[in-house]
Amino acid sequence: MADGTVILDTAGVKRALTRIAHEILERNKGVDGLVLVGIRTGGVHLAREIVARLEEIEGATVPVGEVDITLYRDDFKGHAPHLPVGKTDIPFSLETKRVVLVDDVLFTGRTIRAAMDAIMDHGRPACIQLAVLVDRGHRELPIRADFVGRNVPTSLKEKIAVLFDAANRPTDVVLEK
């Protein structure tokens, strides 16, 4: 476990993800036309957890994909270091779908902007909604989450770590000073 204060333990993470799943269903009136896309890597694991809950509640399959934002980051324009580019896997059409973009922590909004650019390169969804496990504030762009597990005001020096077990299930959320 990372050093710091546990702000969500395993049970709290499970409750937050279940609540997010219910909120997604309520906002979208079910799962028809709904797809989830997780941002690599933590968002992918959380998207799969949310999809499992959606499918359990609704008894219907919900497509889930993953997006890598490396090539869309605005902090590397023109001078990109040699970063490993991960896999984007969206094995379904996004055209006219309601996309729920999933990430672990919302901070400045730049990761979300990059992910939206990547999604738009794969098609034109009817809408994009955002689900995050933790919103820590400090936005640099006008982006807000539609579904939030926990709002955690932080200082710029603090970090939020979402921890996962060996099976990539979220276990704890830790505030690191």
Swiss-Prot record:
Motif PRPP-binding mapped to chain: 99-111
Gene3D superfamilies noted in UniProt: 3.40.50.2020
InterPro entries: PRibTrfase_dom, PRTase-like, PyrR, PyrR_bifunctional
Entry keywords, A to Z: Glycosyltransferase, Transcription, Transcription regulation, Transferase
Catalyzed chemical reaction(s): UMP + diphosphate = 5-phospho-alpha-D-ribose 1-diphosphate + uracil
An annotated Gene Ontology molecular function: uracil phosphoribosyltransferase activity
EC number: 2.4.2.9
Pfam families per UniProt: Pribosyltran (PF00156)
Metal-binding among keywords: no
HAMAP family: PyrR (MF_01219)
Function: Regulates the transcription of the pyrimidine nucleotide (pyr) operon in response to exogenous pyrimidines.
Family: Belongs to the purine/pyrimidine phosphoribosyltransferase family. PyrR subfamily.
Protein's name in the database: Bifunctional protein PyrR
Organism: Geobacter sulfurreducens (strain ATCC 51573 / DSM 12127 / PCA)
Lineage, top ranks: Bacteria, Pseudomonadati, Thermodesulfobacteriota, Desulfuromonadia, Geobacterales
